[in-house]
Amino acid sequence: QCSSKKSADNAVVNATETPVPLGDPFILLHDGVYYAYGTHSNKGIEFYTSDDLLTWKYGGLALNKEDSWADRWFWAPEIYFVNGKFYMYYSADEHICVAVADSPTGPFVQDKKEPMIADEKCIDNSLFIDDNGTPYLSFVRFNDGNNIWIAELEKDLITIKKETMHPCLHVTQEWEKVWPRVNEGSYILKHNGIYYMSYSANSYESPFYGVGCATATDLMGTWTKYDENPLLQKPGKLVGVGHSAMFTDKAGKLRIVYHAHKDKDNIHPRAMYIGEVSFENVDGVDRMRISEEYITPKLVE
């Protein structure tokens, strides 16, 4: 099922087969439609739509920079549907922000024109709502490299409870030490009572950018990285693979979306790819696994 053979039935694919040009991609499934967002435009945050994950259409700007706190560096958007509203967590000018809309296509607007943390540069903010309804934000702080932290949010899903800020991950494993000191792009899910955090290490510019996993039994406790990390690095013909997020597809299958370099010689424009996530029971504990196989989404008119 990880091929684009079906796409020929649904649309005429260009002979050149244009990839979807998103870095730091995120996919939202809402009302039977897949929406993809990511880093690409200097005008804000773009979106693309698909019915089958294989062929995608450009939709325009979901967030225009006029509606944001900043006017440059629009990175790593993640969109969540909560209580009838769509919340976009994204970075702008190396600060973390939230914009809200009534539709997944926008317009997303940042009513309060200020970042979530005004006095500190941060990036890669990701929402996680626990079973009891408590919202959390994982994000990257720039202290001795890029490190992943977590904090509780107020019920407005925008205000960080600063007193709860807790460190999760920093560079510790050998595979992460290619260049420079980077743990970033976190995404948290809960499975059978365990919290799983996927994250990326090394610079996104490095061919050795890759995805690892860490687990915890308490979000505010100790996060333990897998010894077998990275779970994804240079799959198939891809290099520079990372900044991932997970989602459940229409068939109920857990998927992972990530970007890779344009090719082995050029980083940009980065392109979006989609793999599968599974859990393997090892000594009574479910271990996350990421497929080496991947879908190559195609852009159609």
Model-derived features with residue positions:
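Carbohydrate-active catalytic/glycan-binding domains of CAZyme proteins
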Residues: 2-301
